[in-house]
Amino acid sequence: MFKKVLIANRGEIAVRIIRTCQKLNIRTVAIYSEADVDSLHVKHADEAFLIGKPPVAESYLKVDTILEVAKQAGVDAIHPGYGLLSENARFARACVEAGISFIGPSPEVIERMGSKIAARTAMQTAGVPVIPGSDVALADEEEAVHLARKFGYPVMLKASAGGGGIGMQLVRNDEEMRKAFAGNQKRATSFFGDGTMFLEKAVENPRHIEVQIAADHHGHVVHLWERDCSIQRRHQKVVEEAPSPFVDEALREKIGQLAVKAAKAIDYRNLGTVECLVDGEKNIYFLEMNTRLQVEHPVTEEITGIDLVEWQLLIAAGEQLPYAQHEIPLQGHAIEVRIYAEDPVTFFPSPGMIKRFTLPEGEGIRHEYAISEGYKVTPFYDPMVAKLIVSADTRGEAIQRLGRALKQYEIEGIKTNIPMLKQVINHPVFQAGEATTAFVTNHLKVKTGRNP
């Protein structure tokens, strides 16, 4: 096992990784920007290094600086967390070349799955169903219009290198396509350095269901059941739960086997998530594969009793998976909500100083955060400031527990999306387990315009 690990990330996920490392007696090294001096991940780590100014391009994305710190601190592994450099093949390759273990899959797999077009091709070759769409890059808006007519509107125009809902737009006709193409291409180039676009037939009112997989270096691949992430705003997840209320035993078996098949097809190693859309007839379509730990990993931990960060470390250290497929538990129900520093109606960011931060306590309540009273939420990073996770024997009990916890959750000094979360869990469509990705648009009193 590793002796010292650098966490190439910030905020709650860095705190989460540090916690497991401490459990395994692994020393930890944190990195931080000038804006994160007071973040809990800096305080919890054994060592912490200032790496730059607040903008991520001047701190958390500086590969050379992070590797210099890693060498200076004498670490033998780097955990990338999620976001930032977690799915950056160049970073993973630089770690390997520096003789430092990268806690994740190989650079080649990250690169392959980082291109949605390449991922589609790989899955089709493996016999994993994909959404009908273009299998090569779109040359221009006229080709996009031609193919959209071929597949039939509405379609989703997507950036091949995209993620987090950026560079993705629902298009309903030729006029919208011509308006959307150049803007999406420009946005994708700005965010990802790659303006390659493709399109897929839009799946109307689908469920967004993903499967957690784990693969070691000894040929073993397992899935750890599914998560339902259908509650989204601007194509970004807000509420996640496991298991999915929509998935019956037959579908659970089918989607789990498909996820394992997908992982084996690309010789995957470590933890990953196979994301799918499932329509009303329970047809499954591969969407993408995330080659990292997910924000919503705690709900899987709650229903299995498995520490997923520990599994990442074990696999990266060359050990075998602790469980075979038939040994992985599935007990109870868990729901996670993301607490965002944002206006609950417009979704615009709400930076500011946290003046009060009081968390609910009790059985089946879990928190992940890196903030505290006096902490300044800045506009430099993702607005998620905390996660609230509840678990119970049944979904109904979990919803009740979540409702009580949200009533007791106190955070002052910034606006948060807690009022919106209360709307979600109190809505009869959500309570009935019938929510699709159109839930927020169709059922909540929100303005779904983009952030300025």
Curated annotation (Swiss-Prot):
Positions that bind biotin: R338
Gene name per UniProt: accC
Cofactor binding note of this UniProt entry: Binds 2 magnesium or manganese ions per subunit.
The protein's Enzyme Commission number: 6.3.4.14
Short name of one Pfam family: Biotin_carb_N
Residue sites binding Mn(2+) 2 per the record: E288, N290
Residue sites binding Mn(2+) 1 per the record: E275, E288
UniProt-annotated binding residues for ATP: K116, K158, G164, G165, E200, K201, A202, V203, H208, H235, E275, E288
Function: This protein is a component of the acetyl coenzyme A carboxylase complex; first, biotin carboxylase catalyzes the carboxylation of the carrier protein and then the transcarboxylase transfers the carboxyl group to form malonyl-CoA.
Keywords noted in UniProt: ATP-binding, Biotin, Fatty acid biosynthesis, Fatty acid metabolism, Ligase, Lipid biosynthesis, Lipid metabolism, Magnesium, Manganese, Metal-binding, Nucleotide-binding
Annotated GO MF terms: acetyl-CoA carboxylase activity; ATP binding; biotin carboxylase activity; metal ion binding
Residues binding hydrogencarbonate: K237, R292, V295, R338
InterPro entries referenced in this protein's UniProt entry, alphabetically: ATP-grasp (IPR011761), BC-like_N (IPR005481), Biotin_carboxylase_complex (IPR050856), Biotin_carboxylation_dom (IPR011764), Biotin_COase_C (IPR005482), CbamoylP_synth_lsu-like_ATP-bd (IPR005479), PreATP-grasp_dom_sf (IPR016185), Rudment_hybrid_motif (IPR011054)
Positions contributing to Mg(2+) 2 binding: E288, N290
Active site, renumbered: R292
Subunit note: Acetyl-CoA carboxylase is a heterohexamer of biotin carboxyl carrier protein, biotin carboxylase and the two subunits of carboxyl transferase in a 2:2 complex.
Reactions accelerated catalytically: N(6)-biotinyl-L-lysyl-[protein] + hydrogencarbonate + ATP = N(6)-carboxybiotinyl-L-lysyl-[protein] + ADP + phosphate + H(+)
Domain ATP-grasp span(s) in chain numbering: 120-317
Residues that bind Mg(2+) 1: E275, E288
Domain of life per record: Bacteria
Full protein name: Biotin carboxylase
Biotin carboxylation domain location: 1-445
GO terms, biological process: fatty acid biosynthetic process; malonyl-CoA biosynthetic process
Annotated pathway: Lipid metabolism; malonyl-CoA biosynthesis; malonyl-CoA from acetyl-CoA: step 1/1
Names of required cofactors: Mg(2+); Mn(2+)
Keyword Disulfide bond included in the entry's annotation: no
